[in-house]
């Protein structure tokens, strides 16, 4: 619909140039066509007249009147009026929305997919949890947001690569190995001799038991076997990392999250990528030595202070491998790189960007892009749930999936803006009521399936072509409200991709489900008249299709029965 209205407005501008209202050399402005906040202001509004007023040497409202008069007639536009200082409001005819139903039916699974990305490459990194324990609910929020964002970008025509970065080379891995070794030697977290910064969850005992039993972990085709020797710290380290990476992969698979690339921090050192990044920074002239340490002049690139890259003992600070890792993304040809992180990592953003800019390789400012999420509070029975017995210090993603469902967890973790703190109410997520948004949306999809089964049971033969031809009979407010929502879906997908905000899909699906449930309660679908019945079934099937398309972008199932 936006494309149609933009074309009409463009023809109107040409008419004003032809009759002298606008100078002949006036270029069409970059006007917007958008949905007003309230329906009273029409279905769409444009600011075109306000942008053209200066060229016409006219006040915006007067030019708006001239532009409205110059618009060509269209069967899809019922009325055009002017509001405020010169906004032009379009009220669409029912035929415009009825035609949209046909678009949904014809395009099916592809309805809502666009070409904004034009096949360009984007890398989306998310979760990137340290392989030191089970995934917690914060990782779950990162997984839900990142995976849905990747799906939305794919729907907008981007060539998406999903990436998981494993920090498998730091102090935390050493603490993990020491913790598993202590368990393997018979110690507990309360024993004297337990590592000072050791991990205390019950899962450490599970890893130690598997190691001592000589179990083999199949990690993406790479077999790692426990040597049973509690004194062999290096073997324990390899086994523990493989064991926990494998466990995280199983949890992510249950959450319907997968990746194209698993990138190991250790490979950056092994392949010389950290040293390569450091040498590029030195060669660029944006480093200096002081106090035996190597510093990056990151203040030249917006940081609040210069940063140590290499300490006096020769080891690198943690942000150096981060810079090296993102350099590999640039070298791998990503036009865009998007990283989903917890908000507690905010401080690293400027440093990584400064390091990339300092290399003077033509990497754009603001590359990579970041999506930051806030904390999640888990509630049950009105009280906060703080601990998991197995993890020892946090609520795990597996806990939530087992208590509710993967569908509910994905929905609730993505349904609000990432930068807002989130309360996950287990009781609400389990409720089979309209108060539970994922149930409410899924039930709309299942309800259509139920109506189609009922039609078959009653012996009605549904003729979709007949239904499409008879959509004009659906001109009541509730039918048109559903059609309006269906027409919005491609815009919502496009905007969600532009803003990197997949939560907008969830908001939209609730609104579509509400319009559908309202229509269903106010309109008998399986009526005796075949024309009306087929038209209503066609509207229901179109709604079912858009619900399924949107739920797929969120990684949530579209059940046929509930």
Swiss-Prot record:
A motif ('HIGH' region) lies at residues 129-139. One of its GO terms (cellular component) is cytoplasm. SUPFAM superfamilies: Anticodon-binding domain of a subclass of class I aminoacyl-tRNA synthetases, Arginyl-tRNA synthetase (ArgRS), N-terminal 'additional' domain, Nucleotidylyl transferase. It is found in: Cytoplasm. The keyword Cytoplasm applies. Its EC number is 6.1.1.19. It is an enzyme of class 6 (ligase). One of its GO terms (biological process) is arginyl-tRNA aminoacylation. It comes from the Bacteria. Gene3D superfamilies: Arginyl tRNA synthetase N-terminal domain (3.30.1360.70), HUPs (3.40.50.620), Isoleucyl-tRNA Synthetase, Domain 1 (1.10.730.10). Its main location: cytoplasm. GO terms for molecular function: arginine-tRNA ligase activity; ATP binding. It catalyses: tRNA(Arg) + L-arginine + ATP = L-arginyl-tRNA(Arg) + AMP + diphosphate. Keywords: Aminoacyl-tRNA synthetase, ATP-binding, Cytoplasm, Ligase, Nucleotide-binding, Protein biosynthesis. It holds the Pfam family DALR_1. Monomer. Belongs to the class-I aminoacyl-tRNA synthetase family. This is Arginine--tRNA ligase. It comes from Xanthomonas euvesicatoria pv. vesicatoria (strain 85-10) (Xanthomonas campestris pv. vesicatoria). The lineage of its organism: Bacteria, Pseudomonadati, Pseudomonadota, Gammaproteobacteria, Lysobacterales.
